Amino acid sequence: MDVNIAPLRAWDDFFPGSDRFARPDFRDISKWNNRVVSNLLYYQTNYLVVAAMMISVVGFLSPFNMILGGIVVVLVFTGFVWAAHNKDILRRLKKQYPTVFVMVVMLASYFLISMFGGVMVFVFGITFPLLLMFIHASLRLRNLKNKLENKIEGIGLKRTPMGIVLDALEQQEENISKFADYISKVNE
């Protein structure tokens, strides 16, 4: 299946007034995780643009360290995803605690980059955009269009780059099973 790029959402949809933002319910981790995954899928192009702008600024100031940091993060992430497919304990960590899994990848990348001396470039060029994405995805309430787009992505009718990354983190399967459960309840 072909990979489609999600449309760039309007600024007033991406960052509306404060009435469309709310603290997540920290007691219900699955609901919070669903909100984050839904927003990551829906606003993925906006997140990519914001991250590209920040990475460009930091990359312009320190190009070698930025390239080095990007290579290290990609290699560490790929290594952890590969290891998670081969080791049950890592697979469970990745599926049950995706945020912890990403934090472990980022910490491992941090320690590798610290050996080369590019820690500040790593923090501001790579980690800070990821943190901003996570904060926005956690706080932004979903709308009906967001939920509909995510159902289309979840049942496999549309493939996007963020959907592929979330598949690697095994976050899509949970949405598909919830959708299948919902359909079976409706049929009963």
Curated annotation (Swiss-Prot):
InterPro entries: Prenylated_rab_accept_PRA1 (IPR004895). It comes from the Eukaryota. Keywords: Acetylation, Cell membrane, Cytoplasm, Cytoskeleton, Endoplasmic reticulum, Membrane, Transmembrane, Transmembrane helix. It is a multi-pass membrane protein. It is found in: Endoplasmic reticulum membrane; Cell membrane; Cytoplasm; Cytoplasm, Cytoskeleton. The modification N-acetylmethionine is found at residue 1. It holds the Pfam family PRA1. One of its GO terms (cellular component) is membrane. Coiled coil: none annotated. The chain crosses the membrane at residues 36-56, 57-77, 94-114, 115-135. One of its GO terms (biological process) is negative regulation of L-glutamate import across plasma membrane. Residues 136-188 are annotated as: Targeting to endoplasmic reticulum membrane. Residues 103-117 are annotated as: Required for homodimer formation and heterodimer formation with ARL6IP1. Its main location: endoplasmic reticulum. Residues 1-35, 78-93, 136-188 are cytoplasmic. Homodimer. Heterodimer with ARL6IP1. Forms multimers. Interacts with ARL6. Interacts with prenylated RAB1A and RAB3A. Interacts with SLC1A1/EAAC1. Interacts with RTN2 (via first transmembrane domain). Does not interact with VAMP1, VAMP2 or VAMP3. Belongs to the PRA1 family. Regulates intracellular concentrations of taurine and glutamate. Negatively modulates SLC1A1/EAAC1 glutamate transport activity by decreasing its affinity for glutamate in a PKC activity-dependent manner. Plays a role in the retention of SLC1A1/EAAC1 in the endoplasmic reticulum. PANTHER family: PRA1 FAMILY PROTEIN 3, PRA1 PROTEIN. This is PRA1 family protein 3.
